[in-house]
Amino acid sequence: IFAATGGAESGATTSTANITFDDVLELFYSLRSPYRKKAVWVLNDSTVKALRKLKDSTGNYIWNPSVQAGVPDTILNRPYYTSSYVPEIKAGAKCLAFGDFSYYWIGDRQGRSFKRLNEVFAMNGQVGFLASQRVDGRLILTEAVKTLGMKA
């Protein structure tokens, strides 16, 4: 999704280092309405921090945390998830994704295989194991997820 090719469709900010509330709104409404029904935000913790600092023209914070126990915070009334694999805010990086991730499919290409390695660790009285599995993921419908890229 955050790759340069084969990922989600991307929009760009007007800044190389900051996200504005207008950028977030543009990303939200760039996603077609059928996908917004199940859409979620995916971003890095540092991006959450930057979004929480955004203020409107009167100086009020735009972020409204949940006031009910057990109800998560939202961005524009849509839930968000943080991931350390999402790039941080920097020039040229895609730092925010919004969309219906049910169109991101994960495929197991072969079953798991386990191999017992008796000889390798025999001198230490140990037994080793080697496990492998081939897995891949792909965004099947690119219009279902949009990303926000920082200006290069």
Each model region followed by its residue ranges:
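Structured, hydrophobic secondary-structure cores that serve as assembly/anchoring elements
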Residues: 1-152
